[in-house]
């Protein structure tokens, strides 16, 4: 995730780097990149610039959002706060008894175990060998969840979506009676902005927290025999994107292909950073889910608010993250309705991201459980919605 608030890290990149590098663990065989290679980034709708990879990381250190459109230059669809798609979402929760029963099966222990392992990889940088290894581990976990639920016998699948940079994205698909599809997303990659190819990037919050949150929601959702057996009206997909930190590269590739295939995507919810609440508490704010209200679909965002109200023990607070702050941007770019949830209001989110100090010890698994509940509620209600 890209935080628009000025990071405490960026006093000036060079001065901070001198202080930080000695404390960072090094990777034995860093990948070497071509210093002069240029990338076309978009910093706002139709505002583009050619930059080197090092310049990309410098922008991120300064809290500047962008999407890398080097390989995906198709004209975008740019929703504003007041725009809404033609999709009509439920105005009330229709499956409270079923969803509440499923949320009781969600556990913090699963998320903590998974996140401990996920953060043990030196880095999940999308061009690194350990980024491939972490993706492989995650793929195997998703596959196990599907197989153990019995959903594989009814057509549920998990696939690797290959990319040129090495780390693949992951797509779990739970078919319904129609091809109308609801997508739940998080990004699996991490980054250390000082030296991405070399330094450790545990990425516990960004976005290890979102990754294990939606994985736990998948576990819970597949406890429903109706869903697992493919009897829900609509199809549900869970996505774990590669290369979000590079400019939403993985999610762009996926939604570009979906657009070419004329896939009927009715909703996409991104969760990026779901575990840090201390910033909000320190600021005198209540623990709550942060819901983006800029560059998202208005109708879907209202539905998301209703889900939080119905199924979570915390409320929500509206917030803004600017253009291109996470992978929901890619869904919007190709005309699909998207929404975005995070751990708090943006000014109170985790400032340790993109360093070696983005660690589990700062996170609240109680809060992550609330995000898992909203994910499960969102998925189940829309699995049975009449679109």
Swiss-Prot record:
Cofactor(s) needed: Zn(2+)
Propeptide, chain numbering: 19-87
Amino-acid positions noted as binding Zn(2+) 2 in the UniProt annotation, renumbered to this chain: 206, 245, 354
A GO molecular function held by the record: metalloexopeptidase activity
Residues in the signal sequence: 1-18
Keyword Disulfide bond: yes
Cofactor remark from the record: Binds 2 Zn(2+) ions per subunit.
GO CC, alphabetical: extracellular region
CDD domains from the UniProt entry: M28_AAP
EC number: 3.4.11.-
Subcellular localization: Secreted
Keyword Metal-binding: yes
Single GO BP term: proteolysis
Domain of life per record: Eukaryota
Top EC category: hydrolase
Role this protein plays: Extracellular aminopeptidase that allows assimilation of proteinaceous substrates.
Family as reported in the entry's similarity comment: Belongs to the peptidase M28 family. M28E subfamily.
Protein name: Leucine aminopeptidase 1
Organism: Aspergillus oryzae (strain ATCC 42149 / RIB 40) (Yellow koji mold)
